[in-house]
Amino acid sequence: MPAILPDIEPLRASREFRLLWLGQFISQSGSALRLVAIPYQIYLLTGSSLAVGLLGLFSAVPLITLSLWGGVIADRVDRRRMLLVTNTCLALTSVALAVSTQLGVASVPVLYLLTAVGSGFSALDQPARSALAPSLVERRLIPAAMALNQSQFQVSQVVGPALAGVLIARFGLAPAYWIDVATFLVATGALLLMRVPRGDVVIVHAAPLRALADGMAFLWSRPLLLATMSVDFFATFFAVSRAVMPYYADRVFAVGPEGLGLLYAAPGAGATVVALTSGWINRAQRRGLGILVSVAIFGLAIALFGLLPPTGFIAGLALLAVAQGADTVSSIFRHTILQLETPDALRGRLSALNLVFVAGGPQLGQVESGVVADLWSPEASVVTGGLACVGVVFVANVLVPQVARYRADLAHGAAVP
């Protein structure tokens, strides 16, 4: 049993990593509340899966345009201080959501606008957060640290949506947003307690455009990194089905807001099981092959979800859990490869480029699934998206066979093709 449990040595060995990890878990639980509340609020206002799907567009545009610059900034300043600024801005965005909802002025355009603003601040926040974490632990502990980060993220994706369903059903939307505000305050407190040694603060002095170009050139020169990011982008673009979950809760399963919360929480439950038994993942040798197999399972589970009848709510929860569990395995492998193969001075920029791929795919995928649902049907959107995800795996294996062959030497950082 201990061989499959997550390795918590990074939490024991580094006080700063422990503080970052705990604060991030609390704030992400609050953010998960918001990510249920906003789509549900828009669905209540419009009854349209397309309107919900357009949230992805308003989230993706600032994320893609600003995250690259967030990576450049993260490699030029103290990353902890940068996180203090972005955390504060994200908290203020949630305050605006709560106040506008309480005052009854949270129209669809207002919700789109605040989604875009929050996404922009997240685009600046996440590269710094991703780049800071591996610098707080020894190189040999990076795989375990990445698995722990996935664990806390996935647990938050269970806690947040499940709590959101209960809160929205019992108290309304505004309390969910206020709890999100409170979690950002806790995360800010954890950052204030951190003491990152000056020797761990990497400062890049190149001109911003040159620094950005250097990051892109490094990624382009590493087909392995580019391929693993691309697989995730296209897989999630086709298979992410968050935009149609309000439809499934309302029209297919007829389970109300509590059921919607469970539909959003089920993926996190599956991912949590994987993350909490991730010891075997840290010791896996064929990480590239693991990515391909995991993404294929993810796509198949989503396609099967789309075929369920109205009586299939419990089966649907199980399939969503399996899908996200598989995606979590892929994500741990991918993030580990990225951090092992990237010099610390480039981690901010590479984390930003990674964010464009791994967050841009799901956000744009919401638009894609909403459009297909509107033109065809929500069920067809889910089934075809899952099958397209499986197709992405086969294409990637043919075009970049070195992904399936990848191994890594944790002691020296040497990749084995």
Regions found by a protein language model. Give the residues of each.
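Alpha-helical transmembrane-bundle signature of multi-pass membrane transport and export proteins
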Residues: M1-P417
